[in-house]
UniProtKB/Swiss-Prot annotation:
Organism whose genome encodes this protein: Kluyveromyces lactis (strain ATCC 8585 / CBS 2359 / DSM 70799 / NBRC 1267 / NRRL Y-1140 / WM37) (Yeast)
Protein name: Spindle pole body component SPC42
Record has Nucleus as a keyword: yes
InterPro entries in alphabetical order: Spc42
Taxonomic path: Eukaryota, Fungi, Dikarya, Ascomycota, Saccharomycotina
Functional description taken from the UniProt entry: Forms a polymeric layer at the periphery of the spindle pole body (SPB) central plaque which has an essential function during SPB duplication and may facilitate attachment of the SPB to the nuclear membrane.
Annotated Gene Ontology cellular component terms: cytoplasm; nucleus; spindle pole body
UniProt similarity note: Belongs to the SPC42 family.
Keyword Cytoplasm: yes
Region (Disordered): 78-118, 224-257, 281-316
Biased segments, Basic and acidic residues type: 78-104
Length: 316
């Protein structure tokens, strides 16, 4: 049953794994770190605003206390000035009057009237002195107020700059994380490239060694095949045709012994005097004569005997 105002749920039939994407662990870790940093940023912003409100309240209290302090200092200075003026007037009144009158007035209650008279007589002088003092006081107060205002402005500017510096520091942390992940990826790519190059280099070296080995084997076989072919070219065909079968067998045995001796002599010579590597034309050496249909059975038999000798020579 669907209630009013509620939306029906959608059910997806089939394999849910196909709809989900595989997210690497690095991205998950980075997202969790970013969420934590955002949360810390919000908490710190709250703390900063609370501290700012406290600072504003304290600034208000400081301003009120400062005004009271200025007021009381002015009252204190005024009272001090009044006392100094009274003392000065008394001293002048005592000096201006005769001795007997001063002695009489000191014991009686007439000093108040004398002070008033002295003040009345010296109004201009006292007013000038007071005006100078007041001007000095006002100048000092202006200097103090300017200094206090400058200090307050500097403090407020510093407090306003702290959140901006904090925000920039947070942004710089995110940038550092992203840059580090990019650097790691670049290093991984470089390592994979170097591994690939090393594998290719090793494969080329192995291939080069195998080809050199095959070339050396072919050269050895060609050198071994060239020596019996030279001996066969020296023997004339007339002697082979005139001799009987027993003579041919004797000659094959002698050829085998001579080939064995030559092989031993060649081996000892190569062991005592290693020769330089020979460069043979592979195309010319691989070209073997093919039997033509005009050859006689005697020639075919002779070539068969030479092939048997070559095989025995290779076995030796």
């Amino acid at each position: 049953m669907i209630h009013n105002g509620s939306t029906p749920r959608r059910f997806v039939f089939g394999n849910n794994d196909a709809n989900e994407r595989i997210v690497p662990e690095e991205y998950k870790y980075n997202s969790s770190m970013i969420n934590e940093l955002i949360k810390q940023n919000k908490d710190l912003h709250k703390q900063v605003t609370e501290k700012q409100e406290e600072i504003d309240r304290l600034n208000v209290l400081i301003g009120s206390f400062r005004a009271k302090l200025i007021k009381y200092t002015e009252l204190n200075k005024k009272m001090q000035r009044d006392q100094q003026e009274q003392q000065h007037n008394r001293h002048q009144s005592f000096e201006s009057k005769p001795r007997y009158k001063a002695e009489f007035t000191s014991e009686s209650s007439s000093p108040v009237s004398n002070e008033r008279d002295s003040e009345y007589l010296q109004i201009k002088k006292n007013n000038r002195h007071d005006e100078n003092k007041i001007d000095d006081i006002y100048q000092k107060l202006e200097l103090l107020t300017n200094l206090v205002n400058d200090a307050i402005h500097k403090q407020n500017n510093g407090e306003q700059r702290e959140p901006s510096n904090f925000n920039s520091r947070i942004v710089s942390d995110d940038d550092i994380i992203i840059s580090e992940s990019q650097e790691f990826k670049q290093l991984q790519d470089q390592i994979d490239l170097l591994k690939r190059k090393l594998l290719i280099k090793k494969e080329n070296e192995l291939r080069k060694l195998s080809l050199n080995k095959e070339l050396a084997d072919l050269m050895d076989e060609l050198s071994m095949n060239s020596s019996p072919s030279a001996n066969q070219n020296i023997d004339p065909y007339s002697e082979l045709s005139s001799r009987p079968k027993s003579g041919q067998q004797r000659r094959t045995n002698e050829d085998q012994q001579s080939l064995h001796c030559e092989h031993c002599h060649l081996k000892s010579h190569t062991q005592s005097h290693p020769s330089e590597p020979r460069f043979v034309n592979l195309k010319e050496s691989l070209e073997t004569p093919t039997p033509t249909p005009t050859q006689t059975p005697r020639k075919l038999k002779r070539e068969k005997d030479t092939n048997v000798a070559d095989k025995q020579y290779s076995l030796w």
